[in-house]
Each structure stands twice: as structure tokens, then as C-alpha cells.
A protein has these predicted regions:
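PLP-dependent amino-acid enzyme catalytic core
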Residues: 1-497
């Protein structure tokens, strides 16, 4: 299996190169040249396997230059009870008849990013060894909150790596900020940016592809890579949990093998829902992919109209991990939907860079409307949904998951579709305690974040994750705030270039 760049179909590399580079030299994203298939018999054969074994089975289809031993080394180390608070790794909870929550937040940082970022360091260090690179790998991360902490936790003290995380100073929750700024490890760095997530992401991409910076790194015996979902090594682990959850639903008798399900994903950067698209096109019977956005609803408008327009007001919301107006992974989807037309991709994304806007052709619009349904939910709707779920079903969810539930309710109201549905629950309610409490116990005001965590615990009976409880006594190590234009200098200075 080779990987191509979305901006140069003639470029072909193996998965180890795609993972170690993170992004193609032309600024494109790596995609597998074909989507491997998984048959119903294969899905059935996974029923009695552990999550780690299911993951290894899926990875073997995509990472064909890795040996079985290398893949199992990665999966065995990443997906274990030493990293996750459940041996199932991801849990499925029935919310109400035929609607299930896929809980992806049982890892060390209490967000779905752990599902990929616990294994990415093993993928990356294995790739570097396979390629005999003999270079220190410098991981640059732009984060809207969850990726940063999950990447820091995954890469801390990993030999031969250094990681730097940039986050919008006013664009993450207080718990997310505390998680990042207290990070332990000798090879980690964290810096706040005056601006929003898109400023962080655009400048990280710019630093990545700057030839002069690349040359300076090369001379110093270093090379960049990415832990964002622009890196294929981040995206492919997300495909696994959609494959695995279908198998679990069938094994538990909730569905029969072959039955279609809908999948609802709250998303800003489009990676999590793109992983579900890959699972569907491998052979997992997924009917509709439902894309849930907050008021930064650029994806909703795009899926409905075929026009991508980031020229709009940016809102800081209670679901900050989705406060994004430039959805990087959309480039991969459009490459697939245009039958790998790299010229169209370069044209559209050139227009996005220059004008902040592009419109896809009618063929792509047609497929978008067939495969996807999109909706959005504002902060008030999010708050009401958290309360409704808590009151009706005694289930406590975070803000991002609430957005997904509300959009799914809108989908059902519009379509009447009663297909059984899996909703991706992307973060622990404890990561957004203030917003959760504002919904379910508005009298709880004036508390600090740790009192809020304790109050959520009293109301929900969900165990407080140890990693969050321990934050109270940790010292803040990283307090620097810079402008987006200072990011490149910060990187160079941090690396001693």
C-alpha cells in the first residue's frame, strides 16, 4: 500500500514515510492509494478479539510496510489498561432505544484524541527506525484544546523526539489550559497564541513547509513531523474505533451483522468523521454520516451548499474543540470525491488560501449530499441538550457530545429515519465542568474548577479521572503568550537553531 499526496498524485511513499513526514513537501496530505476492504466474515472474526487485536487487524491493511511484530508492538503498548480506565478501551452506552454513545474518552487525557495519540508515538518512532533517519523528530502541534494535551502525554520523554504545542490563549477551557501548562516531561514545550485555532494551525503548516526552516533543521540533525490529524498516523487509529464499535454492537445483539447504522460525529477539523467515512468505504455498513457543528458552522454550510466560505465571524463557544473555520481533513475527502484530481484540489485550496472561499463542482455536491447530513447547534441549544439528556436518561455528557445529540435529533425530525445510530462522545464531562454545571445545576456558581469537578461527580456518579484530580497540585510550567507572527522564532529559539 502506497500513499499519495492530495496535491501530487504522482508522488508515492510508503506509510512509514507518510507518518514520519506528517505532511507532504508540496503542502498536500497523504492518503492511501486505495481504501482496503473488510468483509462481513472478517468483521465477524473480530468479535472475540480485544480492542488491541482489532486495531492490529485494521492497521495491517493500511501499514503494509510494517511487520506484524511491529504493528503488535505498537498496539500492545498503546491500548492497555495502563493507559485507559477500561479494558474495552472505548465503551458503548445505550442512551435510549437504538441510540448509542461511543465513549472515546477513557484514556489518560479524557478526550477522543487519546485513541490516536497513545499509538502515534509508537508509529512514529517505528517509522523513523525503519527509514534509518538518525534525526531527532520535532513534533509541532496546533490545538483547539484536546489534541495538545493528548499529544504531550503521548510523546513526553519519548527518546529522539521533541514536542511543541501552540494553543489559542482565549480559546480553550480552563481545564484544558491547566492540563497543558502543567505538562511534565523533559522534551515538551507549550505556548499560547494571541488569536484563534486557525491562526495556530495555519502558522504551524507554514513553518512545516518553509524550505529555509527545513534546511536549518536538517543541518542541526532534526526533522519536523506532526501530531495533528493532517498526519495519516493520527487518522488511521480513528478508523479502528468505528470498525470495532460495529463489531461490538453486533456481538452484543444490538444489531445483526449486515444491518446499517448511522454515525453522528461532532467535528471541527473533519478528521473524526473522515475516519468514519473510511470505515464505511472499507465495508462497515454505515448508512448516513451526520456531521455536527457548533455555531462556527462552516462545515454545515459546505455540506448543504458545496460552498466553503471561512469569511465569517469566529465565535468562541462552550464546545471549543470545534471552534475551527479551516477544516484541514476536508482536503482528503475532496481528493477522494474528485477521483484523485490533484489539480482541482490545488485550485480549490489555492482559492481558500487567497480568498477564503471555494465552490466544488456539481458531481462532488451530489456525493456530499448522498453520504452526509449536516447540522449545527448554538451554545444555548448545547446547554439545553445537556440538561435534557441528564434529566431524561440520567446520562452526563460534555458540550461537544451534546452538540452531536442535538444535531441527531434535528436529523431525525427532518428525515424520520429510525436507523440505529452511534454517536461519537468525544470528551469526558469533567473537561468542561463549568458548562456542564451551568446546564444541570445552575445554582452552582462561584466555584473554582476543582469544586466544579467534585460537584459534577456528586450529580453524575461518574468516577473523576485521576489525571484530572491530580492537576490541582501540579505547578504551571508554561506561561508564555506570543503573537502568531512570533511562532517561527519561538520554534527556532526553542530548538537552539
Amino acid at each position: 500500500m502506497f500513499y499519495k499526496s492530495t496535491r501530487n498524485s504522482d508522488l508515492r511513499v510508503e506509510s512509514s514515510t507518510a507518518i514520519s513526514q506528517g505532511i507532504s513537501v508540496d503542502g498536500g496530505l497523504f492518503v492511501p492509494e486505495t481504501i482496503p476492504s473488510i468483509s462481513m466474515d472478517e468483521l465477524k472474526s473480530l468479535a472475540d478479539k480485544s480492542y488491541s487485536e482489532r486495531a492490529a487487524y485494521v492497521f495491517a491493511k493500511y501499514l503494509t510496510d510494517f511487520t506484524d511484530a511491529e504493528i503488535h508492538y505498537c498496539t500492545d503498548n498503546a491500548y492497555s489498561v495502563k493507559n485507559f480506565d477500561t479494558e474495552n478501551i472505548a465503551e458503548i452506552a445505550e442512551l435510549f432505544d437504538g441510540t448509542y454513545m461511543l465513549e472515546l474518552w477513557h484514556g489518560p487525557t479524557c478526550a477522543f484524541k487519546d485513541m490516536a495519540l497513545q499509538i502515534l508515538p509508537y508509529f512514529l518512532t517505528t517509522s523513523v527506525k525503519k527509514l534509518n533517519l538518525n534525526k531527532k523528530v520535532v513534533i509541532l502541534v496546533a490545538t483547539s484544546g484536546d489534541t495538545g494535551k493528548a499529544a504531550l502525554e503521548g510523546f513526553k520523554d519519548v527518546e529522539g523526539t521533541q514536542i511543541m504545542v501552540f494553543y489559542p490563549d482565549e480559546g480553550v477551557s480552563s481545564m484544558q489550559k491547566r492540563q497543558m501548562t502543567t505538562q511534565e516531561g523533559s522534551n515538551v514545550g507549550v505556548c499560547a497564541i494571541k488569536g484563534n485555532f486557525d491562526d495556530c494551525q495555519s502558522n504551524v503548516k507554514k513553518i512545516f513547509t518553509d524550505p529555509a526552516m527545513k534546511e536549518r533543521l536538517d543541518k542541526a540533525g532534526m526533522a519536523f513531523s506532526s501530531a495533528n490529524s493532517i498526519n495519516w498516523g493520527r487518522l488511521v487509529p480513528q478508523v479502528v474505533y468505528y470498525v470495532s464499535s460495529y463489531v461490538t454492537l453486533a456481538k452484543n445483539g444490538e444489531i445483526n451483522y449486515g444491518d446499517e447504522i448511522n454515525v453522528v460525529v461532532p467535528t471541527g477539523n473533519f478528521g473524526n468523521i473522515l475516519a468514519a467515512y473510511y470505515a464505511k468505504h472499507m465495508g462497515v455498513p454505515i448508512k448516513k454520516l451526520i456531521c455536527a457543528s457548533n455555531i462556527n458552522n462552516v462545515l454545515t454550510d459546505f455540506i448543504r451548499t458545496g460552498v466553503y466560505d471561512r469569511n465569517r465571524k469566529f465565535y468562541a463557544t462552550t464546545s471549543p474543540s470545534m471552534d475551527i473555520l479551516i477544516s484541514s481533513n476536508l482536503e482528503r475527502l475532496l481528493y477522494l470525491l474528485t477521483n484523485e484530481n490533484d489539480e482541482k484540489i490545488k485550485d480549490w485550496f489555492g482559492k481558500l488560501a487567497a480568498d477564503g472561499k471555494y465552490e466544488v463542482d456539481d458531481d462532488v455536491k451530489k456525493v456530499l449530499s448522498e453520504e452526509f447530513w449536516a447540522g449545527y447547534c448554538d451554545d444555548n441549544g448545547t446547554k439545553n441538550t445537556i440538561k435534557e439528556i441528564f434529566d431524561k436518561y440520567s446520562y452526563t455528557c460534555d458540550t461537544h457530545t451534546a452538540v452531536a445529540v442535538k444535531v441527531y435529533e434535528d436529523y431525525k425530525a427532518e428525515t424520520g429515519d429510525t436507523t440505529k445510530t452511534l454517536i461519537a462522545s468525544t470528551a469526558s464531562p469533567y473537561k468542561f465542568s463549568s458548562s456542564v454545571l451551568a446546564a444541570i445545576d445552575p445554582e452552582s456558581t462561584g466555584m473554582d474548577e476543582y469544586d466544579m469537578v467534585e460537584r459534577v461527580h456528586q450529580l453524575s456518579n461518574i468516577p473523576v479521572p485521576k489525571s484530572l484530580a491530580d492537576l490541582k497540585n501540579k505547578e504551571r510550567r508554561f506561561t508564555k503568550v506570543i503573537s502568531k507572527d512570533e511562532m517561527e522564532d519561538f520554534v527556532a529559539e526553542s530548538l537552539g537553531l
